[in-house]
């Protein structure tokens, strides 16, 4: 059964996901993250009506392993491997990284049927 998840995200990463420049969202294994599965829908708070389909979920032991496998451009476009590793380790220190590194492959959904409060006049 498809579930809808509502999460927070920084504006720069939201814009990259929506434009398709960034296709992978990285999180660690907090309980709410572990619930996300292929086929679910993710929406991000504070950016209006937006939905992303979860195309796939992959799990890694470390951030470095994830970057080596997935590639930097899909995760943090425009950064070098070293800069991406540093950025993600600042967001997720070792104690959080130990929860598992979750990679969510997301695709922005074009919504033909938006709620009335979001419809244009």
Residue ranges and their predicted role:
Residues 1-36:
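Compositionally biased, charged N-terminal/linker segments
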Residues 58-75:
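Short, solvent-exposed secondary-structure boundary/capping segments
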Residues 50-59:
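Short beta-strand-centered aromatic/proline hotspots
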Residues 71-114:
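Glycine- and charge-enriched low-complexity intrinsically disordered segments
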Residues 3-5, 15, 99-109, 116-121:
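Ribonuclease/tRNase effector modules and their secretory precursors
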Residues 29-31, 46-51:
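Short, charged beta-turn/beta-strand-edge "cap" motif at the junction between a beta-strand
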